[in-house]
């Protein structure tokens, strides 16, 4: 199995979003995946002040803290790497075959983060036929983190920002980010996003970004 390369896997889910839990577990069951649920952390709104008046800021940095908590748990368990999913992740039908190719290539390169999809923000250059080097990606609904990057994220203050922009913020020479050539995952556009308070409609954004930046 492709997951044999990874020491563990979590999917992030708020206790209040039982709908997303059911949908995600139904999707993983379809592929025969066994992914551990990780309860999302939630700050109290009154404890978090956003300097530019974003009423949903406490939710966004709660997501950041949740990702930090997953990385901390992976390190505590002694995992050399960890798959991280968010509960609105949707696997493409050819996920298994394409992911297997990517994993085969990952074994032979140095990497810190591996994105299974998302919105690249700059040109991505090929490493192999299956994986590309990227400067960063918007979206953290499906990625893997290597032990080489654990301490980097564990030293971050969650109030610095949204998790995907934090990953983007490191200088290119200080990170080894890899992205799948093919979109392996999307997000459920029919599910209301807690971070944004609306249907995000990200599928077309991701597809268009891939067309633009994957050379």
Q: What does each model-found stretch correspond to?
A:
Residues 1-85, 89-215:
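An acidic/histidine-cluster motif and surrounding catalytic segment
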